[in-house]
Swiss-Prot record:
This is Small ribosomal subunit protein eS31. Part of the 30S ribosomal subunit. It comes from Nitrosopumilus maritimus (strain SCM1). SUPFAM superfamilies: Zn-binding ribosomal proteins. The gene is rps27ae. GO terms for cellular component: ribonucleoprotein complex; ribosome.
């Protein structure tokens, strides 16, 4: 049986590293919780899992 290949390089697009600190770039969905990020559009943030939409002011 083949082993796991490792993590996807696309995961690193969600985080920013500044020295010793790691911060999230995208907003976390308030309904789904940790691990689910919201997509950023021109006028709103949308969760692809539950469909929650937060409009920007």
């Amino acid at each position: 049986m083949a082993g796991k290949k490792g993590s996807s390089p696309n995961v690193y697009a969600y985080f920013k590293v500044d020295g010793d600190k790691v911060s999230r770039i995208k907003k976390v969905c308030s309904r789904c919780g940790k691990g689910t990020y919201m997509s950023e559009h021109k006028d709103r943030n949308t969760c692809g899992k539950c469909g929650l939409t937060e409009f920007k002011q």
